[in-house]
Amino acid sequence: MSIQNLNSLLSHNVKGQTENLLIVDTRPFSDYLKGHIPSSINLDLMQFHWLDTSITGIKQFNRQSRFLLSNLGIQNKEKVIFYDDTSGPTAARGLWLLLYFSYKEVAILDGGFSKWKEKGFKIEKVTNQFQYSRFQGKVNSDVLATSKEINLVIGSKKNSKAYIIDSRSEKEFDGTVVRGGRRGHIPKAHHIDWSMNLANGYFKNYNELARVYSDFPKDKQIIAYCQGGYRAANTFLALKLLGYKKVKVYLGSWGEWSSLQNLPPER
């Protein structure tokens, strides 16, 4: 959603739309207190990392995520808008999380709070309260990859079975910067820094994004990963904007992969 469209909805209190709109600020609470979009609630999604994609780990992730989303007060048929400072990773993570639970009435605010503020739109400092609901979204495994699935991909003799995209920085990818248990990247991964998705804080237009991902056929499975599944969620969204149908986020990402000694790294 554009900042202009959201501002119009809030400014004119469009009947039947603003009442069914939930705006979620995914920045740190300290930033939220300094000013935020009117009526938005705060959920610092960077605090909700999950690095265990074993069968038990995914079951726990599902349980904890439903609890988290219930605290947001998400109701059926309600439009949810996530935002951060730009069109960044935490807002994209919120969108991906709802899609994982088959909730389709979701978007991010393109440009984020920095562009909202830059345009001079209204800002408030009051802390808006959560309204609890019982969220019971149905899991959509088509958007989440596990370490087991990644291992099957890299073990396949057919390189075309799926494409793996590393959304981290180049220095993380080549092992110059070490975050996690080991340095390097997942074998067979292609490196495209998530920041290539943006220009001046907004998502690039279709043609510009298409050039970034021109090496990846739309009929193949794409799996994005980063350190903890946030930058990868931004890549997930970019690919969805381009019309890719089979896109997943490796939830555990490098944080999990590098900690499991039985899984091979590459440099």
Locations of regions flagged by a protein language model:
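Cytosolic catalytic domains that perform sulfur/thiol-centered chemistry
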Residues: 1-267
